[in-house]
Amino acid sequence: MLSPSHLAVCVATLQDIKLFNNNLDVVDDAFEYLMSKAQKGEKGQYFTPRYVIDMCVKMMNPTVGDKIIDTACGSSGFTVHSIFKVWKDIRREKGLPEGEGFTAAQRIPEETNFVRDNVFAIDFDEKTVRVARTLNLIAGDGQTNVLHLNTLDYSRWNEITKQDDWNDTYNEGFKKLKKLQPKSSSDYSRFQFDLVMANPPFAGDIKENTIISRYELGRSPIGKWQNKVSRDILFIERNLNFLKATVETIYEAMKAVEEEVY
């Protein structure tokens, strides 16, 4: 926690730095610096290069009607890039200047409605979520749906979301996320998103039986539950369950699934 005097020094240093009307690379680099290399490496967290994110967004081509989520959001690059892309489409269709991604200019209702209702992100690391929420606010969404949850361990979501501190920060976004479950599911195992763009953490195995037993990829080739499963393997199944049946998921730099499972 910064003391008032230290905070004053920080503000004095940063006050002349231009954040608005800037590109994502500059702002995101500043926030990635807040996450130490040691901390990211221990948890398998590595921020996806912005040019890779830009390529994925262009390939997936999100539109104003799409529901979008990043299930391992890190600094929320996939969702912020998607927001900027759709905003440009909206403004182009209305004959308005496309403008900058990061800007202090007021957004038109169609832009804010898209972000408020369609764009979500989840991460298990609280500090990373704070960075992602801040980036979303700087981007101009005004109200972020970035949630601090463990995507894989969804059986504990009810327990987590009942905590007062969690509710104060995330409840509004979580209520909107719950509405995207199919009518046949109420345990957070399935959702109805159009697009999932994610770069899940690769480091470490999941060893908790309560998590592994909820995934078909937690079984061995002969059908027995495994004692441990690579985290990114479980993310494959989990992300597919976030999607409607007819759409695709992008994983950048994924290892060969067969090598990981077998």
Residues covered by each model-derived region:
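Conserved phosphate/pyrophosphate-binding and hydrolysis machinery centered on Walker-type P-loop NTPases
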Residues: 20, 24, 46-50, 229
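Glycine-rich, acidic and aromatic/proline-enriched surface loops and short helix-turn segments
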Residues: 36, 84, 202, 245
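Conserved S-adenosyl-L-methionine
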Residues: 45-175, 187, 191, 195, ...
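Conserved Class I SAM-dependent methyltransferase catalytic core
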Residues: 224-262
